[in-house]
Amino acid sequence: MVLLESEQFLTELTRLFQKCRLSGSVFITLKKYDGRTKPIPRKGSVEGFEPSDNKCLLRATDGKKKISTVVSSKEVNKFQMAYSNLLRANMDGLKKRDKKSKSKKSKPAQ
């Protein structure tokens, strides 16, 4: 997995969306990141690890290529604005769900 800066991540994410426009999917995950690079041991003493500030880890993949970035709490507003604009621009292939009318279901069958 490639760890990128925020701007590079958005550029690569745009490329992933363009590549998967006709067929394929892009999977995006977002989770809290505390800066650990090693897993927490199940048993034993836990070292006093204190994260310096809150961070978010974003990952994106198309099944073959994986990219990720870490966004700190200081730059989250700037990143969120650019990220939301990117999603609005590239999620135009979504289909609306067919809503079934309630009037047809409420009539008793005779």
Swiss-Prot record:
Q: Name one GO biological process term.
A: SRP-dependent cotranslational protein targeting to membrane
Q: Which Gene3D superfamilies match?
A: Signal recognition particle alu RNA binding heterodimer, srp9/1 (3.30.720.10)
Does Cell membrane show up as a keyword for this record?
no
GO cellular component labels: cytosol; signal recognition particle, endoplasmic reticulum targeting
The domain of life for this entry's organism is Eukaryota
Q: Where is the composition biased (Basic residues)?
A: 96-110
The principal localisation class reads cytoplasm
Recite the UniProt keywords alphabetically: Cytoplasm, Phosphoprotein, Ribonucleoprotein, RNA-binding, Signal recognition particle
| SUPFAM superfamilies for this protein | Signal recognition particle alu RNA binding heterodimer, SRP9/14
Q: Which InterPro entries match?
A: Signal_recog_particle_SRP14, Signal_recog_particle_SRP9/14
Keyword Phosphoprotein in annotation: yes
GO molecular-function terms, A-Z? 7S RNA binding; endoplasmic reticulum signal peptide binding
- Residue ranges for the region (Disordered) are 90-110
Residues modified as Phosphoserine are 45
Compartmental location: Cytoplasm
Purpose: Component of the signal recognition particle (SRP) complex, a ribonucleoprotein complex that mediates the cotranslational targeting of secretory and membrane proteins to the endoplasmic reticulum (ER). SRP9 together with SRP14 and the Alu portion of the SRP RNA, constitutes the elongation arrest domain of SRP. The complex of SRP9 and SRP14 is required for SRP RNA binding.
Q: Which family does it belong to?
A: Belongs to the SRP14 family.
How is the subunit organization of this protein annotated in UniProt? Answer: Heterodimer with SRP9; binds RNA as heterodimer. Component of a signal recognition particle complex that consists of a 7SL RNA molecule of 300 nucleotides and six protein subunits: SRP72, SRP68, SRP54, SRP19, SRP14 and SRP9.
PANTHER family hit by this protein: SIGNAL RECOGNITION PARTICLE 14 KD PROTEIN
Q: What is this protein called?
A: Signal recognition particle 14 kDa protein
What taxonomic ancestry is recorded? Answer: Eukaryota, Metazoa, Chordata, Craniata, Vertebrata
